[in-house]
Regions:
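Short active-site neighborhood of thiol/selenol oxidoreductases, capturing the structured segment around
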Residues: 54-84, 95-99
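Short loop/turn microsegments at loop-to-beta-strand junctions
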Residues: 41-42, 63-64, 140-141
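Extended hydrophobic-aromatic, low-complexity segments
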Residues: 55-56, 66, 74-79, 106-109, ...
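Thiol/disulfide oxidoreductase modules built on the thioredoxin-like
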Residues: 127-170
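Short acidic-hydrophobic, aromatic-tinged amphipathic segments that line or gate anion-handling sites
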Residues: 47, 120-125, 156
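Structural microenvironment flanking redox-active thiols in thiol-disulfide oxidoreductases
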Residues: 77-115, 126-133
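Oxidative protein folding and maturation machinery
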Residues: 1-54
Length: 173
């Protein structure tokens, strides 16, 4: 939310003659304003490694973790082993959907990170999540935690903030 306030303030500071800069801030504000905590996350089609297509909203679980990642991303290569080793992310109350959101599906098929059997390892056909701008993904991996109704609980979370949230909600059960 702080970034949204910053963008709005920047737009107010611009004079009317700076149309290109104003449009840039307006675009960023639209992107950041998508899938806000408390809103229902944008649904999308994904395809798993077996070629089976499903909708994100059809994943039935008390909680769903979306991990938007790219096998060629250096930060993803560093972060994925930590996520894979996290026992909280193996809990049965949590469905994990590791998603490659871009269009180079051949690269995704040949460079995938070994994903636990319980997780869903998938891509979006034709990279529609990335190309349609349905999720604001300024860097990867990007973590979104959703509830059973697919409402956003955490947006672009860090691993630490995700862990803290999950410890709080999963230990209450």
């Amino acid at each position: 939310m702080t970034y949204m306030h910053f963008l709005r303030a920047q737009m107010e500071l611009l004079n009317d003659g700076d149309l290109a800069e104003r449009e840039r801030y307006a675009f960023l504000l639209r992107m950041v304003g998508q899938n806000l905590p408390g809103s229902v996350a944008r649904d999308f089609v994904f395809e798993d490694r077996k070629g089976v297509r499903s909708r994100m909203h059809s994943v039935a679980s008390p909680f769903t973790l979306l991990i938007f990642n790219d096998p060629e991303c250096e930060t993803c290569k560093e972060m994925m082993p930590k996520l894979l080793a996290d026992p909280l992310l193996q809990r049965e109350e949590l469905a994990v959907l590791a998603i490659y959101p871009d269009s180079d599906t051949e690269m995704w098929k040949t460079h995938g990170t070994p994903i636990p059997e319980r997780w869903i390892d998938a891509c979006t056909p034709n990279g529609e999540v990335m190309h349609n701008g349905w999720y604001y993904l300024p860097a990867m991996p990007s973590l979104y935690l959703l509830d059973a109704q697919k409402r956003v609980l955490l947006k672009d979370a860090t691993h630490d903030s995700l862990r803290q949230y999950l410890i709080g909600v999963l230990n209450r059960k």
